[in-house]
Amino acid sequence: DEMFNLSELISVVIEKYNNENISQNLTPRIYFNGRKNLINRCLNNLIDNSLKYANKVEISLSKKNTNLFIIIDDDGPGIPKNEYENVFKPFYKIDKGRADSKSSVGLGLSISSDIIKSHGGNIMLEKSKPDGLRVKVFLPV
């Protein structure tokens, strides 16, 4: 594990996409002690996922008490609430909506969830306003 600037890492990841449809609202200088390469992979998986299904993606980073929150909102078709648990299973793909004609093996969310859990955190899904998907990542400081 290493201490690194998570705000900077997220910013660098977003810049690599060179996509004007990704906006960011990052609290500066938030540091995290963890495996930077794995957090980087997780961020890429989550952003890739959102971009597959949405036009606009917004990423925010904040800190409350002893938790860090990374929130990724997209304006895609969303996922039915009854599928929220299932999409974290390896190779699981929803038949309709988000899975239509998209090339995916169904591992991105599973791997991301494993990475976050290995850091003592969690990933949750909820409906984004107005209709997309919100991915909430909690990490303990």
Describe the predicted segments one by one.
Residues 120-121:
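Conserved glycine-rich
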Residues 56-66:
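Short beta-strand/loop element within the Bergerat-fold HATPase_c
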Residues 79-92:
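Short conserved segment of the HATPase_c
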Residues 39-40:
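A residue-level detector for a conserved hydrophobic packing site
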